[in-house]
């Protein structure tokens, strides 16, 4: 049996803030295997966001080996964010 998906402590706050500015947000946390945490639709664009808890030390915010591999093989853009501000910046100022 698969265990429950791990959700970062700041996910609810980030999701709420993104929805407040008009984004559509779908949690992908249950997918696992390194898949990013959120799929975000905003201003006719899609974003994949990997959430990290900005209150933890940098070493605890590192990508897991599964996340590193998922990001490596994905042929699209994935943004790692650790706060409401960085999540909003990621969708307002895409790379």
Language-model segments: residues:
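Catalytic phosphate/metal-binding cores of nucleic-acid and nucleotide-processing enzymes, i.e., regions
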Residues: 1-95
